[in-house]
Design a protein with these regions (language model features):
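Active-site-proximal substrate-binding groove within the catalytic cores of carbohydrate-active enzymes
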Residues: 138-140, 147-156, 194, 361-536
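Surface-exposed flexible segments
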Residues: 25-29, 203-207, 342, 470-482
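Aromatic- and carboxylate-enriched substrate-binding clefts and catalytic-loop regions
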Residues: 102, 224-443, 449, 477
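Short helix/loop capping segments that flank catalytic or ligand/cofactor-binding pockets
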Residues: 201-202, 238, 467-469
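Short, flexible loop/turn elements at secondary-structure junctions
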Residues: 54-56, 68, 120, 139-141, ...
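Carbohydrate-recognition beta-sandwich/jelly-roll modules
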Residues: 2-227, 333
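Surface-exposed beta-strand-to-loop junctions
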Residues: 190-192, 350, 457
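A generic structural motif
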Residues: 77-80, 222-232, 492-503, 536
């Protein structure tokens, strides 16, 4: 019998608290403090519930440790904090490696899985070594300890022992279903176009109409209506770095001069036979607001404008009104962006410090989860896609999540790197409908490679979107994209990767009836491109 599984439903062997006033050496044995906080670990419905009680000393993190024998483990694969940034990779047992939310451990025969259920109140990260498993639960508010007034469940721990007869990818998918009891899934397939990666914000009502006509030509054989998604570039305030500093926030009740009315644009899209979609950034504005509504920290990548504090009830009301207004314009899909960055920055791990949100009784994850639920409630029956959002919080709230990094209409290497997010395909239709981002069709990128990317999305049943310069496709390319969109409109072919284990970019896929696909992501540069920039 392989030594590669520890039952996390057993009571942890140890707990350790990091308080707001803990010393830097709080993990050193000679710095251990007598526990002054209460925590419970109870097993209900095959999950270990971690309940944290109010503490006189605000708590920042809780460390739980299960000791056991994992000496036969060969490889581990963790998830990403929010969207993947080429960081979802198989590796050998690496004890200091942080694995957000959950991880898989392969022992050469079976895949064992360890994690927490979606919707956790704390930011959860695992570490694994041959002698045990460590779980860190980050319950900070901003960079400070949480000041919770009542006991609350900070995470629900789950695990799954694999079987040697299972395909590892299937084991991972089953575990994702175990982590998310009530996924929200789209009623119809999400496919069509998003105009970001060919227009990069240079759009108008007229360009959207031209694009919609081209979309309907590409989707001539589709069995459902496609989406025409209007991305960044419609709002009244938008500046590029070459002008007044980069800004792409609100207010959202006004358009720029290139659009007369976003409701009229949505209606015109519908009249052409497509569904309408639109993008917005809910937590950034140029509006003057009272100081308590401002976020405690400014996003360094957006030096202009104001970031809003989503823990404040007035901010939630503003976001709700904006979302409901956009839905009232007739948009069938709403994509909201940047909420994780506008609240916590690019990484949750390096944000310690004396800063906090307006409501100090909530953790960072509770604040964001409440924001996502507010947006979904206001969107009504519209499909919502989260971008730059926390995937483990979006699950069970939104129908889709942008799971990977940006693709590109400027060079394919960025798109190839974004293929790493397909390592998250076990989450597809278990958490939500995975959105790998857009294939791009411009004069600067290879159409064949992007058709492969789009087909990969379609055959697996993932969100299938492209950014297509109107009129750019050759006849052969048009014929192929029609076939791809037809497959996407039917919900895909049920294709699964056959090279998920041990890789970080998958190439080989097979359908249940034995049809095989092999995508060569490296032929564009005869390998990989090493020297490039996002803008070239």
């Amino acid at each position: 019998m392989k030594h590669s599984f520890i039952n996390l439903l057993n009571h942890p062997d140890s707990f350790l608290f990091q308080y707001e006033d803990s010393c830097v050496r709080f993990e050193e044995p000679d710095s251990y403090e007598e526990k002054v906080s209460k925590i419970d670990y109870t097993v209900e419905n095959n999950a270990g519930k971690i309940t944290l009680y109010p503490s006189e000393r605000p708590i920042k993190r809780v460390k739980l440790r299960w000791r056991g024998d994992l000496s036969d483990g060969l490889m581990v694969l963790g998830d990403a904090y929010a969207r993947g940034i080429q960081d979802i990779n198989w590796m050998g047992i690496t004890p200091n490696h942080i694995m957000p939310w959950y991880f898989h451990l392969y022992d050469g025969e079976k895949l064992n899985c360890f994690g927490v259920k979606t919707g956790a109140a704390g930011m959860c990260s695992f570490q694994c070594d041959p002698f045990g498993i460590t779980l860190w639960v980050d319950v900070r508010n901003g960079g400070c300890g949480v000041r919770n007034k009542e006991p609350f469940v900070i995470a629900e721990v789950v695990c799954r022992e694999g079987k040697s007869i299972e395909v590892p990818f299937d084991s991972a998918h089953e575990f994702c279903k175990q982590m998310c009891n009530n996924p929200v899934l789209p009623k119809e397939p999400i496919f069509g176009v998003n105009n970001w990666y060919w227009a990069y914000g240079n759009i108008s009502h007229e360009s959207v109409m031209t694009e919609t006509d081209y979309l309907m030509e590409m989707c001539r054989d589709a069995k459902a209506k496609p989406y025409m998604i209007i991305d960044d570039g419609w709002q009244i305030n938008r500046y590029s770095a070459k002008r007044q500093g980069y800004y792409n926030g609100g207010p959202w009740d006004k358009t720029n001069a290139n659009f007369k009315s976003m409701a009229e644009t949505s209606d015109a899209i519908h009249q052409k036979g497509a569904k309408s979609g639109i993008w917005f950034r809910p937590l950034q504005t140029f509006m003057q607001v009272q100081e308590p509504l401002e976020a405690p920290r400014r996003n360094p990548h957006s030096p202009t404008g104001i970031n809003l504090d989503p823990s404040h009830p007035d901010v939630l009301e503003m976001v709700s009104k904006d979302t409901a207004m956009i839905r009232s314009w007739g948009y069938d899909l709403i994509k909201h962006d940047f909420t994780s960055i506008d609240t916590l920055g690019n990484s949750p791990y390096n944000e310690d410090g004396d800063w906090h949100f307006y409501d100090r009784s909530l953790t960072n994850m509770q604040i964001l989860k409440r924001l996502y639920q507010t947006i979904q409630n206001a969107a009504g029956d519209a499909v919502v896609i989260g971008c730059n959002t926390i995937n483990h919080l979006v699950a069970g709230i939104h129908a889709s999540q942008r799971s990977g990094n940006d693709t590109s209409g400027r060079n394919f290497e960025i798109t190839r790197l974004a293929c790493n997010c397909m390592m998250r395909f076990p989450q597809n239709n278990a958490f939500f409908n995975v959105d790998p981002d857009c294939a791009a069709f411009t004069e600067k990128v290879d159409a064949g490679l992007n058709l492969d990317f789009l087909e990969n999305c379609a055959i697996t049943g993932a969100v299938t979107l492209a950014s297509v310069t109107p009129g750019i496709l050759k006849d052969s390319e048009m014929n192929r994209i029609r076939g791809i969109y037809e497959v996407a409109s039917k919900g895909g072919l049920g294709a699964k990767p056959t090279d998920w284990l041990g890789h970080n970019v998958m190439s080989r896929f097979e359908t249940p009836d034995g049809e095989k696909f092999n995508f060569d992501w490296y032929r564009g540069y005869d390998g990989v491109r090493t020297f490039y920039t996002w803008n070239d």
